[in-house]
């Protein structure tokens, strides 16, 4: 009897295991949402530089101003394919939240951080990390001095490229203004009569 009972229990156990292995629950969502493509605006830009770093901002609004860590992630230099503008973009790891987002301008200057050969400090008048433009004093630190130098080299290349672009743009504007001035002067001269023309006409009529 004991052997028969054990055999029966083994059969029940194997049956339960078989049922569990065959059981494949599928949960259908209550509401099916269509997949949406999320654009980051990076689709229209060319990646010129990418490197891992840590970003800081100077919290001057605090009672005791100090450097605050903004996040660690990949810092990128991105050039717009049509407009030619170049911006610095950095997102935090995992969350991908933006911690730096501003255009490179000719006036920007990377300055070495005191006591470190792998960190730079610079000012930006309009950083859009918090969506609203805000003036910030930022600092970025790399793994080593070599990486920091690579960033500076590319940053300077971008800054000079934007500077040249703006010079060409201002030159075109100056040329356009000169052409307009000449056309205006020409139209005025055509509309004016010589001073001796009027008396001559009067004499002929007499």
From Swiss-Prot:
CDD domains: RanBD_RanBP1 (cd13179)
Residues the record lists as Phosphothreonine modifications: 13
Keyword Zinc: no
Modified-residue entries (N-acetylalanine), positions: 2
Modified residues (N6-acetyllysine): 150, 182
Pfam family, one: Ran_BP1
Record-listed N6-succinyllysine modification sites: 150
Transmembrane spans: none
GO cellular component, one term: cytoplasm
GO-annotated biological processes: nucleocytoplasmic transport; positive regulation of mitotic centrosome separation
Stretches assigned to the RanBD1 domain: 26-164
Residues with the Phosphoserine modification: 21, 60, 187
Stretches for region Disordered: 1-33, 162-206
Biased composition (Basic and acidic residues): 1-26, 162-184
Keywords: Acetylation, GTPase activation, Phosphoprotein
Subunit note: Interacts with RAN (via C-terminus of GTP-bound form) but not with GDP-bound RAN. Identified in a complex composed of RAN, RANGAP1 and RANBP1. Identified in a complex that contains TNPO1, RAN and RANBP1. Identified in a complex that contains CSE1L, KPNA2, RAN and RANBP1. Identified in a complex with nucleotide-free RAN and RCC1.
PANTHER family: RAN BINDING PROTEIN (PTHR23138), RAN-SPECIFIC GTPASE-ACTIVATING PROTEIN (PTHR23138:SF182)
Protein purpose: Plays a role in RAN-dependent nucleocytoplasmic transport. Alleviates the TNPO1-dependent inhibition of RAN GTPase activity and mediates the dissociation of RAN from proteins involved in transport into the nucleus. Induces a conformation change in the complex formed by XPO1 and RAN that triggers the release of the nuclear export signal of cargo proteins. Promotes the disassembly of the complex formed by RAN and importin beta. Promotes dissociation of RAN from a complex with KPNA2 and CSE1L. Required for normal mitotic spindle assembly and normal progress through mitosis via its effect on RAN.
Listed name of the protein: Ran-specific GTPase-activating protein
Origin species: Bos taurus (Bovine)
Taxonomy of the source species: Eukaryota, Metazoa, Chordata, Craniata, Vertebrata
